[in-house]
Amino acid sequence: IDRYTELTGKSPMLPRFAMGLHVGTYSGGTWKNEEMTSDKYPPALCKRLREEGVPFDLLWLDSTWRLFNTTYGNGGCCFEWRNTFKDPKAMFDSCYAQNVKMVGLHIRSILDNGPEYHLLDKAREQGNVLYPGAKIEGVVNFFDPKAVDWWWENGVMKVASIGAKFVKTDVGGTMDLKGLHNIFPLAYAEAPYRKFQEYNNMRGVTHTREGYAGIQRYPYIWAGDWGSEWQWFEPVIRCLLYTSDAADD
């Protein structure tokens, strides 16, 4: 393991509270029920968990906070809130007032247009932001520091500036090129990990699904879209034990 981590990197220290329980929510509306989401739901969930004595420290909002546009539907990310979230900043503030340490958001590597920011069009106009070897136009070129800076300033800061403190990265396996298919998730996970670490002025945290040798440098790893029954949970335990043996977390 020492030789492996000397080559691929070691897991960094995390904020102490990041070792606690993480809770995810669809904000009251799961897939195909997005109209049921509300910015009132996450604070109400926090309140209920506190009342029940559930000790959690991190909360993230899964996909349904995002406005799904017609270009890529739920597969793209325009960093715009759906209209059921009337006051996202107040939502973040309410969660933090209940001693939640970090609130994060699920995102995708594919940019999309929204009615306000037109992020995909702006990336096209900027040039050198999107990766030309992706299966779908719109994937950010996370190998290029300048593209990462543009993505951060024009996309992520729309949510970080009002309270998001980390992201849950999804759709990391978007490269057709075999030589980059496994490397892309590393660059994708590194970008928000380092950016939020600097912006929050604390040890970094991110959630990533895809990875490769070295992904342990940007923890955490999440297991993907699994059910809550034991038939799903048991293999996750086995998987994470193997991952731990590989020094990934």
PLM ranges: what are they?
Residues 1-245, 249:
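Catalytic-domain carbohydrate-binding cleft regions of carbohydrate-active enzymes
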